[in-house]
UniProtKB/Swiss-Prot annotation:
Cofactor names: pyruvate
Cofactor note as given: Binds 1 pyruvoyl group covalently per subunit.
Highest taxon of the lineage: Bacteria
Class of the enzyme per the UniProt entry, highest EC level: lyase
Listed EC numbers: 4.1.1.65
Keywords linked to the UniProt accession: Cell membrane, Decarboxylase, Lipid biosynthesis, Lipid metabolism, Lyase, Membrane, Phospholipid biosynthesis, Phospholipid metabolism, Pyruvate, Zymogen
Protein name: Phosphatidylserine decarboxylase proenzyme
GO molecular function: phosphatidylserine decarboxylase activity
InterPro entries: PS_Dcarbxylase, PSD-B, PSD_type1_pro
Gene name as annotated: psd
Length: 295
């Protein structure tokens, strides 16, 4: 009964207005009020501020500054094996496994298709048929910054407008196609292990999605698809320089928690068989072993 009520609320709640108002509040410089609210949040969620590069609360003028805090440089050791792809975010692995043709997994007997997740862009879909995937949910208390599983050269970025349903695991396991219906930013990288997609999923009260090269992508929420292309000859056609991001380097962030999805090509990587749904994910841990495509 509770699950049905939670799903019904996803349709009834004014999600855009809630997200807008929470975003305003999170950006407010409230002085001692903000610091007390942050302290209360830390207490409720038992956050270890020793992991932060700024453990002193006076360093955070707004809730957003706290939510997007950086980790201490030694907080998440990066697996340095060049064949190892690492987990890109702190959170919970909600799904991991193989892609069956274009079917990623099923929710309530309804399949998730690459076509829906990638908004029908066949040139991208083709890279991941029979590939593999991982979905990581980022709770509010975790680090909201997203990192690179391996070194990659940026090829395309797509902003897909959509809804702002909750991506909490209790909702996503009972409500079909949330990731294909929510707004999202799809980043396509060319790597030594074939193509990789890193997809940042929007959700209710996620005030912003940003990347390190474009800055804030959303808001504004104008309801239109935006597409950035980068050439394959190391000449960025939408900017002055090619964009190469190194393994373990930051690539984006959420202002409040959400979900990141990674897609890999067929026979390009072997997922870490020790990882299972609902395992804790930590940045830098081994995610997969890659087969280099270098000749």
């Amino acid at each position: 009964m509770l699950e049905k009520i939670q799903i019904l609320l996803q349709y009834l709640l004014p999600k855009y207005w809630i997200t807008y108002l929470v975003g305003l509040g999170a950006s407010w410089k409230g002085g001692w009020i903000t610091r007390y609210a942050i302290l209360l949040f830390i207490h409720i969620y038992k956050i270890d501020m020793k992991e932060s590069d700024k453990p002193n609360l006076t360093d955070y003028a707004t809730f957003n500054a706290f939510f997007t805090r950086k980790l201490h440089k030694n907080a998440r050791p990066i697996d340095t094996n060049p064949s190892t792809l690492i987990i890109p975010a702190d959170g919970i692995i909600t799904q991991i496994g193989k892609i069956n043709q274009t079917n990623i997994f099923r929710v309530k007997n309804a399949p998730y298709h690459l076509d829906g997740l990638l908004a029908g862009h066949d040139n991208i879909i083709d890279y991941f048929i029979n590939g593999s995937f991982v979905i990581i949910y980022i709770p509010p208390q975790n680090c909201h910054r997203i990192y690179m599983p391996c070194t990659g050269t940026l090829r395309e970025v797509l902003y897909i407008p959509g809804n702002l349903f909750s991506v909490h695991p209790k909702i996503t396991k009972n409500m079909p196609n949330i990731f294909s219906r929510n707004e999202r930013v799809i980043c396509l990288f060319e790597t030594d292990f074939g193509y990789m997609a890193q997809i940042l999923i929007g959700a209710i009260i996620v005030g912003s999605i940003e990347t390190t090269w474009l800055g804030t992508i959303t808001p504004p929420r104008e309801g239109i698809v935006r597409h950035w292309r980068y050439s394959s000859n190391n000449t960025n056609t939408d900017a002055d320089d090619s964009i190469i991001l190194q393994k373990g380097h930051e690539m984006g962030l959420f202002k409040l928690g959400s979900t990141v999805i990674n897609l890999f090509g067929d026979k390009k990587v072997i997922l870490n068989n020790l990882l299972q749904p609902y395992d804790i994910a930590r940045i830098g841990m081994p995610l997969a072993h890659g087969h280099s495509q270098k000749k």
